[in-house]
């Protein structure tokens, strides 16, 4: 089961990716982790990426995509993988598609969490961190995990915010890239949808309503994955 996973910041994409990883026993691959791993191991690609990062630049696709391909060829990816956070735009989607095809790697499923931009932004700005345990979920805009006043809903501890969660300009910039249907991330999603339409539904496109809570979204996702011939959960 080889999956590309899309969703805007604030959609819970990372949480759902972790659930898929646990359920199906496939690695949840994120580009940031790939960069850090290559840099820490001192690979040729890692050294090249570090030069760009140290200068405050973006790592070019000519480095990022080979890193991703190397990761997808590792032993733990033989039974499948979930790629999260790439591609981020149409050009990357096109280049990744070409590279995967050249390597004989097929994408089986494209998952897209659908969420209105305003809701996604509110969810980011509504996040609250418990000083006792960051894993205690609190969000002033999500009823299921709304804090108890100004206290943690789980333990009653004090709550704080992350500065980047309150940076509206940064949030808007990320969302500008994601919601751009001409050149941005959503344009990349459309690219893979067009491939699916021309290729008898391969890759399979799964759209998820991101408005409900984590449990409901996960149940919808598992239900749709069970409808594929690639479903092989470990539990």
Task: Name each region found by the language model.
Residues 1-235:
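Glycine-rich phosphate-binding loop of ATP-dependent small-molecule kinases
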């Amino acid at each position: 089961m080889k999956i590309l996973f899309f969703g805007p910041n604030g959609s819970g994409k990372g949480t759902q990716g972790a659930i898929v990883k646990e359920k199906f026993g496939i690695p949840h691959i994120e580009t940031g982790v790939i960069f850090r791993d290559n840099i820490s191991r001192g690979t040729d690609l890692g050294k090249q990426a570090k030069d760009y990062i140290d200068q405050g630049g973006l790592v070019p696709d000519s480095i990022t995509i080979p890193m991703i391909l190397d990761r997808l060829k590792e032993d733990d990816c033989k039974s499948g993988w979930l790629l999260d956070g790439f591609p981020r735009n149409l050009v990357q989607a096109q280049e990744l598609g070409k590279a995967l095809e050249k390597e004989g790697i097929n994408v089986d499923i494209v998952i897209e969490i659908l969420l209105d931009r305003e809701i996604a932004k509110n969810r980011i700005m509504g996040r609250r961190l418990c000083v006792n345990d960051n894993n205690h979920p609190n969000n002033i805009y999500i009823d299921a995990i709304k804090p108890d006043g100004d206290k943690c809903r789980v333990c009653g501890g004090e709550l704080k915010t992350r500065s980047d969660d309150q940076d509206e300009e940064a949030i808007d910039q990320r969302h500008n890239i994601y919601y751009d249907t001409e050149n941005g991330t959503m344009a990349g999603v459309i690219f893979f949808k067009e491939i699916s339409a021309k290729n008898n539904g391969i890759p399979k496109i799964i759209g998820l309503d991101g408005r409900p809570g984590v449990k409901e979204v996960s149940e919808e996702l598992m239900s749709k994955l069970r409808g594929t011939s690639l479903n092989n959960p470990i539990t």
